[in-house]
Amino acid sequence: MRSFTTLNGLAAPMDRPNVDTDLIIPKQFLKSIQRTGFGANLFDELRYLDKGEPGRDNSNRPINPDFPLNFKRYEGASVLLARENFGCGSSREHAPWALDEYGFHCIIAPSFADIFFNNCFKNGILPIVLDEEIVESLFVEMYQTEGYRLVIDLPAQTVTTPSGNSYSFEVDEFRKHCLLKGLDDIGLTLQHADSITAYEAERAKRAPWLFAASE
């Protein structure tokens, strides 16, 4: 998993509350269990004027000219500014996969759905909760400023705006450690590989019948 320390990223808006995981990545794209291939269909029902299908070439599809992520000013955005209860709905892990592959490494909102919030950390995305008034002020500044970039400092736990305003955020120490080190569940397990190997070797000595090859 990619590590996260500081991010100086262009911000883009998702200016609606209660964005659910089906809107983030529609159900017809959930057939794959691979982590890749979902970014092209992130917010598919909002980005395009027709219905997307798995394996379809998106280059010829009609785009929605009113959807902000289709605006040139938000190309390459890595910070998503959202409203309350972002990521509600089903617990599909494909949602953070799609956001990450599209290029979003941080999401700022007044609140998140719990399962989505946890899944973000497991996939290298930093979800930041800020007061609703602060989020509103960020939306106002972003709409007024083309090329609006936010500096996300995970070690210091701050979000800094182009105007110099800095806002602190809370993050669980263990989750912070995992993001800083780029550790997902597999990475955490591999940190104890020597201990696991030693345990298995000792267990094989004590109960060899469990490890005997079947004839």
From Swiss-Prot:
CC annotations in GO: 3-isopropylmalate dehydratase complex
Keyword Amino-acid biosynthesis: yes
Pathway: Amino-acid biosynthesis; L-leucine biosynthesis; L-leucine from 3-methyl-2-oxobutanoate: step 2/4
The keyword Amino-acid biosynthesis is assigned to this record: yes
Keywords: Amino-acid biosynthesis, Branched-chain amino acid biosynthesis, Leucine biosynthesis, Lyase
Reactions the enzyme catalyzes: (2R,3S)-3-isopropylmalate = (2S)-2-isopropylmalate
Single GO BP term: L-leucine biosynthetic process
Free-text function comment from the UniProt entry: Catalyzes the isomerization between 2-isopropylmalate and 3-isopropylmalate, via the formation of 2-isopropylmaleate.
Family that this chain belongs to: Belongs to the LeuD family. LeuD type 1 subfamily.
The protein's name in its UniProt record: 3-isopropylmalate dehydratase small subunit
Gene source species: Saccharophagus degradans (strain 2-40 / ATCC 43961 / DSM 17024)
Gene name as annotated: leuD
